[in-house]
Amino acid sequence: MIHNDKLYVSAMNGTFVMDLDTDRFQWICRNAQSFTIDREENLWILIGTSLYKMELAHPDNQKHYALPRYGIQFEPKRIMTTRAGDIYFVVLGGGLYRYDKQTDSFIHYSQESGHLLSNYCYNVTETNSEELLVTSDKGVTFLNPFSGNTRFATLGANLPITSIADGCGILVCRNNELFVGGNDGLTSFYREDLDKMEKNYSLYFSELYIHNKRIYPGAVSGGILEEAFPFSKSIRLNYKQNN
């Protein structure tokens, strides 16, 4: 993450900030699963089941949130800041949480409350329309944080990928195209396309060809068709008639 001409990065041996002018790194804390910077110049860091709030101007001024004390028993995966300045993080098995500044606590969004497709969440980001995009083991949730309205896109149905796991990424493009990574590939789509009604086409088969030869009803074609192909309910072919 680049913020105020500085690069913030987490590695196996810790979380660091790099001055882009001098190329010098400074150690901040031990390695984090995820981190974000809010509009008040605070660095929020997820480490295990702990959340740390650190002032960028005064790194020694920190606050520690032991998440199990707030009923968050599972390990968080990703944390982010929205354009409105809200802090959200997803928990694998625990759903989605928002930090409430007024109460200094966390508001929970879950599958049981109807806000999420699944509680097993891997990643979260914000779309250009200020919806939250949350990936999970069942698919993608679009959550409007202001109204609470949701839209679900399930794996294998709305999305051509069949599974999502921890580490699969999300990308929101300027033209509103969305990219979601899965275990079996990458898919892209537009949010508005999910709401388009599928057309119910009435399809029928007009002609039958076997080995580039048109098949007509009657014995001349080997009895494959007893009547015209559009009116045939079924046909039987042998192993030599598979082309």
Label the model's feature ranges.
Residues 7-11, 27, 33-39, 43-47:
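Solenoidal tandem-repeat scaffolds enriched in leucines and small polar residues
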Residues 12-13, 214:
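Soluble non-transmembrane domains of integral membrane proteins
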Residues 6-9, 42-45, 86-89, 131-134, ...:
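Conserved beta-propeller blade signature
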